[in-house]
């Protein structure tokens, strides 16, 4: 096993939420068909691409040798800089509300067998338990090098273990306001198996670690995700050929 560097709703609940949004948009369009200022509800899924790569976990053991390690991320806040060739996929293109977010989770092994190790227990011991995640809204600090971001708001933390092997969607009871140009980041207080490695160079992400403290086990374990609202943090690590598997749904009322 290696490192790489609200209220949960069911899929039915999220489908209903989107259906309600679409219905609202339709009613607005019908109510004022001649109004030049009227416009349909805008819904954008930040981070969504035509294909989602599988998470790099669980690992595989052959003849007691770890051939393919389970890859996870932990103790970090990060966001995708490029996803499948799309630049700045988590930068808000307009002011609106983040109403939900999703995360694609692998199913790490929980038992010692001839082909697997107890990955969950390993990561629990090394990074903390349970597996957790939340999203945050970051405001870039202009002119900062390496780049710095200020956390302006964040969602509640979600426990991920019950959702291993699936892609849960978490609808927010209190949607998060995001301004144009701000970034929706993923925060991992402990660890999460939502990481895809060995992708094309058209995938890269930036993490909240200091330069030269990006890849060792000590760097990962000693990392601190950005969870203090109003605080500013340096995002000094840039990881290529990898992807954080999450999305955020941005809505703008007409």
Model region roles, listed by residue range:
Residues 1-12:
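N-terminal secretory signal peptides that target proteins for export/translocation
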Residues 13-17:
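Short, hydrophobic alpha-helical membrane anchors of single-pass surface/secreted proteins
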Residues 18-29:
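Bacterial N-terminal signal peptides
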Residues 32-38:
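Sec/Tat signal peptide C-region and signal peptidase I cleavage site
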Residues 38-59, 219-254:
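Activation corresponds to long, low-complexity, non-globular regions
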Residues 39-70, 121-219:
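Aromatic- and Gly/Pro-enriched, solvent-exposed loop/edge beta-strand patches characteristic
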Residues 71-93, 167:
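Short beta-strands within extracellular/lumenal beta-sheet-rich domains
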Residues 91-114:
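Extended extracellular/luminal ectodomain segments enriched in beta-structured repeat modules
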């Amino acid at each position: 096993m290696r490192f790489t560097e609200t209220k949960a709703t069911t899929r039915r609940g999220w489908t209903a939420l989107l259906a309600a949004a679409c219905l609202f948009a339709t009613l607005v369009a019908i109510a004022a068909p001649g109004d030049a200022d009227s416009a349909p509800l805008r819904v954008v899924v930040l981070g969504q691409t035509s294909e989602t790569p599988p998470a790099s976990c669980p690992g595989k053991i052959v003849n007691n040798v770890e051939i393919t390690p389970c890859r996870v991320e932990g103790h970090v806040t990060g966001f995708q800089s490029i996803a499948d060739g799309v630049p700045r996929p988590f930068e808000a293109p307009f002011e609106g509300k983040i109403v939900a977010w999703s995360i694609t989770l692998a199913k790490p092994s929980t038992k010692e067998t001839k082909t697997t190790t107890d990955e969950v227990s390993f990561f629990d011991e090394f990074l903390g338990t349970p597996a957790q995640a939340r999203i945050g809204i970051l405001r870039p600090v202009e002119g900062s090098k390496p780049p710095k971001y200020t956390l302006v708001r964040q969602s509640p933390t979600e426990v991920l273990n019950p959702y291993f092997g699936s892609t849960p969607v978490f609808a927010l009871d209190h949607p998060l306001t995001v301004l144009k140009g701000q970034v929706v980041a993923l925060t991992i207080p402990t660890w999460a198996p939502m990481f895809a490695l060995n992708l094309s160079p058209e995938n890269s992400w930036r993490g909240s670690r200091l330069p030269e403290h990006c890849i060792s086990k000590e760097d990962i374990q000693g990392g601190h995700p950005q969870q203090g609202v109003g605080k500013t943090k340096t995002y000094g690590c840039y990881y290529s050929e990898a992807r954080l598997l999450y999305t955020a749904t941005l809505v703008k009322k007409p």
